[in-house]
């Protein structure tokens, strides 16, 4: 079995352009081709900018990722989360700034607990 590749890069600030560059370099270094639909699941455990501002992925990171994907011609992008506290994830997504990001980028943001689900058989799926 092939060992997985892991890329670690330093980013000194939450700057979407710098993050986009790191993601671009990483995609190139891994030899990836990205096409089709892309689902981005940031980690939004909770969000409270006053008390626990480090319990979610900063939306600027996701903005950089969205920019990189759009640069590659990906147009079907969705951001979604399903929190585990019993509190609607949309509240955390809003507090964290993901709905503002959606307005800025045109990428929809969904709460997976409130969104319609559909079973899809992956006929060409491969276990990694």
Give the label of every model feature segment.
Residues 1-128:
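N-terminal and secondary-structure boundary signal
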